[in-house]
Amino acid sequence: MTSYDEEAAINPKAVGNKSSLLKYIIGGGVLAVVGVVAVMVSLQVSGNLVKSEANTLAAQSSGAQRGDRLDLDNDDDLEDEIKEIDDKFKKEFDTLLDNVIQEVNKQLKADLNGGATAGGVNNGGDTDESSNDTDEDSNDSDSKDTDSDSKDTDSDSKDSDSNDTDSDSNGSDSKDTDSDSKDSDSKDTDSDSKDTDSDSKDSDSKDTDSDSKDTDSDSKDSDSNDTDSD
């Protein structure tokens, strides 16, 4: 085998071609390496970009999910607060309603008790009783009548001769229930001073000449027509 110098001396053109080919091969290899490195770098950069974008998207998605969870938590808190306010309002309303009902019941009871008391006073305050009768026979005389119209509880406006149940025309000794059966005009032993038939001893059950029905006031009794005098 000949050396490089010998071959160059014999065929210089061939040697030059080989050198050029070697240069192309080396240059192509370098370019290939550079290209591979560039591709790897670009892939690395692209991968990093993809990872970054993926992380960003993941973060956004996670944040959205966290936001949803927070919103749900806030909704629960809001519902609890609304429920608490509603329960408090119901309790206050029920308490107020109970107080109003109790107050109304107290007022009704007070009104009923007041009505009963007023009725008792009216029933007990009857001034038309036989014990308080101011028209006593012991003080009754035609000349000295102490039963004036001002004290007469039976007003004269209601007295009429037509309604007189103890009229002088009908007051005979046989029908007189005021112990007139023993009284006579000529032998009158029932004097005013000894008259024992006072209204204070007359009970309401036997007294048929009560003040409530007595329409024969003294102002219309005259001595001339009085046949039933004490």
UniProtKB/Swiss-Prot annotation:
Compositionally biased residues, Basic and acidic residues: 141-161, 173-223
| Keyword annotations from UniProtKB, A to Z | Glycoprotein, Secreted
Intracellular or extracellular location(s): Secreted
The segment annotated Disordered runs over 112-230
Q: Write the lineage as a comma-separated list.
A: Eukaryota, Metazoa, Spiralia, Lophotrochozoa, Mollusca
Q: What is its main location?
A: secreted
Per the record, its GO cellular-component terms are: extracellular region
Report whether NAD shows up as a keyword of the record.
no
- Tissue expression as described in the entry: Component of the acid-insoluble organic matrix of calcified layers of the shell (at protein level).
Task: Respond yes or no to whether keyword Glycoprotein is given for this record.
Answer: yes
> Which residues are tagged as glycosylated in the record?
N17, N132, N139, N163, N170, N225
Biased composition annotated in UniProt, kind: Acidic residues: 126-140
Kindly provide the name given to this protein in its UniProt entry.
Answer: Aspartate and serine-rich protein
